Amino acid sequence: MTPDPIGPNVELLEQLVAFLERLSDAQYRHVDERLTTASIGGHVRHVLDHYRLFLAGLPAGEVDYDARERDTAVELECAAAAAAAGIAAQGLRAVPAAHLGRPLRVHQQGAYQPGRFDACESRADRELLFLQSHTVHHFALVALLARAQGLQPPARFGVAPSTVTWLESRAGAAAAGGVLARG
C-alpha cells in the first residue's frame, strides 16, 4: 500500500484552487477550436467528477467513473469549481485509513460500444493512485489550454511528480529551468 495516497491528491486539488483564482470565468469557459472541443472548465469538471464519484462510491464499494455530470456550474464557473475542489479535498481527508485497502468494483463503458460496460476489481488506495495520475494528465492539458490563451499556469501544474523529480535531479540543467521555472 502507498504510504499516503490521499495527500498527493489533496495537494493537486489545492494546486487547482490556486490556479482557478487566477482565471476569469470567460478564460475558464473559452474553447480554442484549433486545439480541442473542451474548455479548461470541461477538463476541470471531468477531474472533479472523478473525485466526486470515487468518494460517493467508496462506502458501497462500487465506483462508476462514467456517471459524470456535464454542463454544470463546475464546468462554467471558477468559483463553483474551486468550491467543488475544496469539497473533494475535505472528503479525501475524511477517508479513514482503514478504508484505503478496501476492495472496490470499478465500472466504465467499454470501448466505443454503446451499452457495453466493463468492471474490474480494485482497491481504494489503487484508485487514489489512478486519480492522481488522471488529474496530473488533465492538468497538463489545462496548462496547454491556458498557455494558448496567453496565461501562465503554476510551475508544477500538470507536471508528473516523477518528471519534477527527474528535472530537479539534473541540477544546473537547462531543462529544469524550462519546465519548472514557468509560472
Q: Predicted segments — roles?
A:
Residues 1-5, 9:
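Short, extreme N-terminal leader segments that mark the start of a protein/domain
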Residues 9-16, 40-54, 78-92, 131-142:
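Alpha-helical transition-metal enzyme core signature, strongest for iron centers
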Residues 139-157:
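Short conserved catalytic/interaction loops centered on acidic-Pro-aromatic/His motifs
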